[in-house]
Amino acid sequence: MIVLGIDPGSRRCGYGVVAREGARLTVVESGVLVPGDLPMAQRLGRILEGLDALIARARPVEASVESVFSGASPRSALVLGQARGVALAAAARAGLPVFEYAPSEVKLAFTGNGRAGKDQMLRTARMLLGAAPDLSDEADALAIAVCHLARRAFAVPAAGAGRAAAARAAAARLRPSRRDHRGTP
C-alpha cells in the first residue's frame, strides 16, 4: 500500500509518499514544495499543481493530512486552513480517501512521544525510514504517512461517500466480544 502524507503550509508544503509491504516501510518520494515569494493565491496554485503532479507520479491509494493546529495566532490558523484546503482538494480530485490526524497523534505514532520536537522527528525519519529530510516539513509529512499506515485499521476518512461505512467497520473492530467481563454470554 502506498500512502501520501502532507504537512500543509502556504510557504512550505511538506510531502512524503511511503509504501508498506508487510512490516517493511519504504520512502517512495519526499520533499517540500516551496512556491516562492508570491501573492497567496498564486502560492496556493503552485502547491496544488505540485501535489497534482506528485499524485500522478507516485500513485498513492490514500492520503493523510495533519489537522489544523491553531497555535497563538488566528491569522496563522486561517492561512494554514487555506493550505490544507488545497491539499484536501488535490487528494479529492485524484479520488483518494483522505484521513486527518492531530499533530500530537502523529508525533506519538512516529516517535513514541506526543510532544516530540523537530530534531526528534528528523532523527526518527532517518532511523526508521533511512530518509534524510532537509527540513522538518518533509519529516513531518513522512511521519503523517507512517502514522496513517500504523493507524489504518481503525482510520475513518475525513469525508466522502465511504465515511459512514468505514466508521461502522472501525467501530465493529473496537466492540468487545459478546461475553461480558465475567465470561458469560
From Swiss-Prot:
Assigned EC number: 3.1.21.10
Biological role stated in the UniProt entry: The RuvA-RuvB-RuvC complex processes Holliday junction (HJ) DNA during genetic recombination and DNA repair. Endonuclease that resolves HJ intermediates. Cleaves cruciform DNA by making single-stranded nicks across the HJ at symmetrical positions within the homologous arms, yielding a 5'-phosphate and a 3'-hydroxyl group; requires a central core of homology in the junction. The consensus cleavage sequence is 5'-(A/T)TT(C/G)-3'. Cleavage occurs on the 3'-side of the TT dinucleotide at the point of strand exchange.
Residues where Mg(2+) 1 binds: 7, 137
Name recorded for this polypeptide: Crossover junction endodeoxyribonuclease RuvC
Keyword line: Cytoplasm, DNA damage, DNA recombination, DNA repair, DNA-binding, Endonuclease, Hydrolase, Magnesium, Metal-binding, Nuclease
Annotated GO MF terms: crossover junction DNA endonuclease activity; DNA binding; magnesium ion binding
Quaternary assembly: Homodimer which binds Holliday junction (HJ) DNA. The HJ becomes 2-fold symmetrical on binding to RuvC with unstacked arms; it has a different conformation from HJ DNA in complex with RuvA. In the full resolvosome a probable DNA-RuvA(4)-RuvB(12)-RuvC(2) complex forms which resolves the HJ.
Organism: Anaeromyxobacter sp. (strain K)
Enzyme's top EC category: hydrolase
Active site: 7, 66, 137
GO cellular component terms given for this protein: cytoplasm; Holliday junction resolvase complex
Family: Belongs to the RuvC family.
Matching InterPro entries: RNaseH-like_sf, RNaseH_sf, X-over_junc_endoDNase_RuvC
GO biological process, any: DNA recombination
Transferase in keyword set: no
A Pfam family the protein falls into: RuvC
CDD domains according to UniProt: RuvC (cd16962)
Cofactors (names): Mg(2+)
Annotated binding of Mg(2+) 2, by residue: 66
Catalytic activity field: Endonucleolytic cleavage at a junction such as a reciprocal single-stranded crossover between two homologous DNA duplexes (Holliday junction)
Gene behind the chain: ruvC
